[in-house]
Amino acid sequence: IAACLCMACGGSDSKDYWGDTSGGGDEEPTENPNASKPRYIWIDAAANFPDFANSKENIARDLALAKDAGFTDIVVDVRPTTGDVLFKTNHVDQVKFMYAWIGSNYTKVERTATWDYLQAFVDEARKQGLRIHAAINTFVGGNQIDGGTGLLYRDQSKAAWATQMNMQTGITSVMNTSESAKFFNPAHPEVQTFLCNLLKDLASYDLDGIFLDRGRFLNLQADFSEESRKQFEAYMGGIKIQN
């Protein structure tokens, strides 16, 4: 976010950094055909956790800078790659910590605040006249950071939700691989129900949109579970396939 806001400067008047096409020369500025288009700024959860995890004041400060720099839309990452969330829901745990670079150190930043992270952004965006969107890492269920965090590490009853990968050694759960982000199997019906419930809770906020990042299978090696094989066989009209 700091890089995106480098255009901001002091003063209370909003400045149009987007309409001048003169390039700084002596020519008269001409109307920029893109001046009226939306301009988005993406607020990554981990990278901005040191500033925003426990400070509504910092959120207000940086959204004011974004408005002054000419941005029209804020996208807030509320489900990072651990699979836990930064909005109100009963279906998965809240994010309690993230790792971020502070100076030259990769540091664990804990969230001790109890106020609603997403709601703080919504409230401030409305004050600033900005549109507000939420983004989630859709099919991520955990991350190997800090010895393993997220639903797939906490709840062994959800082991079948983890994507199965076609490795040289055979079909293997993503939990037993070096993949840092532990993906769900998008084809699993219980995974779909779980995520739909999350999205219902997310949609209850006063949002202008929801971004579904990582709304996909992990990679070409996934998914090779029995569940996916059966669904694919049914889709192909009953043709039997050997994994």
Q: What are the language-model segments listed below?
A:
Residues 86-99, 140-175, 215-243:
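Aromatic- and acidic-residue-enriched segments that line the glycan-binding/catalytic groove
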Residues 71-113:
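Aromatic-lined carbohydrate-binding/catalytic grooves of carbohydrate-active enzymes
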Residues 32-56, 137-205:
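Active-site-adjacent "subsite" loops/lids of carbohydrate-active enzymes
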Residues 57-84, 205-209:
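Catalytic domains of carbohydrate-active enzymes, especially glycoside hydrolases
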Residues 5-35:
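Bacterial Sec-dependent N-terminal signal peptides
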Residues 66, 74, 125, 195, ...:
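Conserved, mostly hydrophobic/aromatic
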Residues 51-69, 98-128, 193:
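Aromatic- and glycine-enriched glycan-recognition loops and surfaces
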Residues 39-43, 74-76, 132-134, 210-213:
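Hydrophobic faces of well-ordered beta-strands that scaffold small-molecule active sites
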